A protein has these predicted regions:
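Conserved small/polar residues in nucleotide/adenosyl-binding loops
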Residues: 222-227
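Non-catalytic RNA-recognition surface used by pseudouridine synthases
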Residues: 118-180, 186, 196-198, 204
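Flexible glycine-/small-residue-rich
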Residues: 54, 66-69, 113-116, 138-140, ...
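A short, contiguous, amphipathic alpha-helix enriched in charged residues
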Residues: 77-93, 147, 151
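Short beta-strands and strand-coil junctions in structured, solvent-facing domains, enriched
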Residues: 16, 72-73, 119-121, 190-192
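Glycine/acidic-rich beta-strand-loop module
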Residues: 91-126
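S4-like RNA-binding module at protein N-termini
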Residues: 1-80
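Residue-level signal for inorganic ion chemistry
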Residues: 32, 112, 136
């Protein structure tokens, strides 16, 4: 792939676009052992050797981060009032990263951050029906009948009849009247899990995504607070 030298260096976190242009002008950058002074010079990412002050700078087109999103953080690239998931990637200066899908502000768990648009499309495409599993604490005791309702495809409201989902009851706390559950859905509608439990007369008290397709969140990271 051919790419401008200044973009190459900025993508690889050598500095901002203006900073790397200054490095180039000061003759601190070499390509294949030759000093290059034009920021617009084209670099072959598959074959050229780029060095800054004698240090090799390799290129990788795509980057992938698996994030355990905390509550209170928004699934966006930029926000004037709230911390975003991109803000949490503190060691990275790339400007083309984005979250694959979104989790509600109060929802925790697995979120993928990348600049790979093709992978994001495959994970989010409605035609793919990529599984997403959540751990939740929900109000009340979940019955076998409600498990079957989820399995048969739940009518949520006039805008949503959910595809068949797998609901597994883990435990019931009779003192505090809540159930711990795992639920696996095959689509990603707006507030879907919360709306599904509202439809059966329950309420989500805590929600954390623990798998996205074949990618699991480390089990040591998804303990939950008591409601």
């Amino acid at each position: 792939m051919l790419i401008r030298l200044d973009k190459y260096l900025a993508d690889m976190q050598v500095g901002t676009r203006s900073e790397v242009k200054e490095l180039i002008r000061k003759k601190r950058v070499t390509v294949n052992d030759n000093i290059v002074t034009k920021p617009e010079s084209k670099i072959n990412t598959d074959g050229d050797s780029v060095n800054v002050d004698g240090n090799a700078v390799g290129y990788h087109e795509y980057e992938y981060f698996m994030l355990n999103k905390p509550a209170g953080v928004v699934s966006a690239t930029d926000d004037n009032t709230c911390t975003t998931v991109i803000d949490l990637i503190k060691t990275n200066n790339r400007k083309d990263l984005f979250p694959v899908g979104r989790l509600d502000k109060d929802t925790e768990g697995l979120l993928i951050i990348t600049n790979d648009g093709a992978m994001a499309h495959d994970l989010l495409s409605p035609k793919k029906h990529v599984d997403k599993t959540y751990y939740a604490k929900v109000k009340g005791k979940i019955s076998d009948m409600e498990v079957k309702q989820f399995a048969n495809g739940l009518f949520v409201d006039e805008e949503l009849t959910a595809l068949p989902a797998i609901l597994k009851v883990l435990s019931y706390n009779s003192d505090k009247d809540y159930s711990e559950i795992h639920v696996t859905i095959h689509e990603g509608k707006f507030h879907q899990v919360k709306r599904m439990f509202t439809a059966i007369g329950s309420e989500v008290l805590f929600l954390k995504r623990i798998t996205f397709g074949a990618l699991p969140l480390d089990c040591l990271l998804y303990t939950s607070p008591s409601p």
